[in-house]
């Protein structure tokens, strides 16, 4: 008996030691990562991550400082990522991942304000099949961002002088300017011009003109071009130029669960931004997507900043800040695949249709799907997935638990994954300096967009689509609340109807008795706008626009030529009431098409 009594304390101590080890904090500096060394730390930080996985440590800590990460030694892995590149644009889907978290649970990465400074073209961090990962207080930037910035310095007929940002690398070869970076050259460029006087981001042909003109360097960072006499850009404006090929993404979260990014600052993202793909429960808390204040840069993302594709559970975006995107700051959607062939009574061959979205897992066993009529965007039947078989990067075979609807039209109708659709909350956030929309959201589950500011988004501040013939992204929405937001001078670049809020499904058959969207409420918002309409709504039932204030500004010239404040097309049971106009009172307030008078109730005369 005494022998066993001696063994018990030893067992307890072993258990306690093992349990304590699981709770230990792992420090990247213990693995050789040295802040401010300006040396490649990628293998050292990855070793610390791997140690957390091996031991079950709960915290990975980066002491404050700068840590440099190069492609050499980084993980290379093939990922098919939604909305990125076609087979022709980027034949290889292998990504260079700076830091890889694979099958890691319940880990907090504490950044302590540290900066990860990346080099070359890289996907900064990837989370694959993780659960309960939280990343706190970390800055991510690139030594040479893939976006270049060129400011017009002097402009005269026939000559244009520019200043290139200190982070923009260039060379002049045979009298023509070229942009390059660390291990890359910019070939197929897209250009957006920023006007500091109007704070607008507009599409520009300026780079096309400069790159075709003879150039000579007159001082480091200053280049003079012999440009056509009619080329007269505005001195002080800045061109933001980036390659259109989305060969990497800013940050990738794949098929994971319960992920939180908190006080993360993404100062530049190449390709596409933070992409969350088929992930459940994501919280973006005080995430800032914008250049470092001391960088002098305008651009923070080559395209979208937060992109959610096929996610489920809840997507929460709270107290975030977005400035400097060449596409949409927030985009939430699914992916519809087209029905190509009926293999048997319960099996369909489906195809990814859009060029830039294919190859990923779009359906999982047990998922509920809806069959979508492409012409009307109607969900006309449902089923449960029994099996999925990948045929190629573009083609999958899906077997269902019941017979395929006889009314399904092959090579036209689509299949939507209803399980992989999230609830969405976007609150207390700020959107600015983008040439496109502020928020795109399409999900059948509850959406709340509340207490945000949309400041001079180039197109509609909020766009709700639904399509099975363009991007093939999701079907109808059922429950959307847009409340307490402030919209300031949005849609100067256009969009559906040039509207501040646009509800624009892709259905070709417009019938108020067969609406696409339903139950969209727009309440207690303030619209400061230079143009109309404030709202464009197509094929929506149960549309409510109530107790909103509209203030007319003169920030930009009116561009739409539309005198109507509201433009409703094929809507049913629409209510517009309690609208307060300040400044100019419009002479014509509401335009309707493809709907009956009884389908609109309004207090506006």
Curated annotation (Swiss-Prot):
Keywords: Glycosidase, Hydrolase, Repeat, Signal. One of its GO terms (molecular function) is alpha-galactosidase activity. InterPro entries: Beta-barrel_GLAA-B_II, Beta_helix, PbH1, Pectin_lyas_fold, Pectin_lyase_fold/virulence. SMART domains: PbH1. PbH1 repeats lie at residues 256-278, 312-334, 421-443, 444-466, 477-507, 517-547. It comes from the Bacteria. It holds the Pfam family Beta-barrel_GLAA-B_I. Residues 1-20 form the signal peptide. Its EC number is 3.2.1.n1, 3.2.1.22. The keyword Repeat applies. It catalyses: Hydrolysis of terminal, non-reducing branched (1->3)-alpha-D-galactosidic residues, producing free D-galactose; Hydrolysis of terminal, non-reducing alpha-D-galactose residues in alpha-D-galactosides, including galactose oligosaccharides, galactomannans and galactolipids. Belongs to the glycosyl hydrolase 110 family. A subfamily. Alpha-galactosidase that specifically removes branched alpha-1,3-linked galactose residues present in blood group B antigens. Has no activity toward linear alpha-1,3-linked galactose residues. This is Alpha-1,3-galactosidase A. It comes from Bacteroides fragilis (strain YCH46).
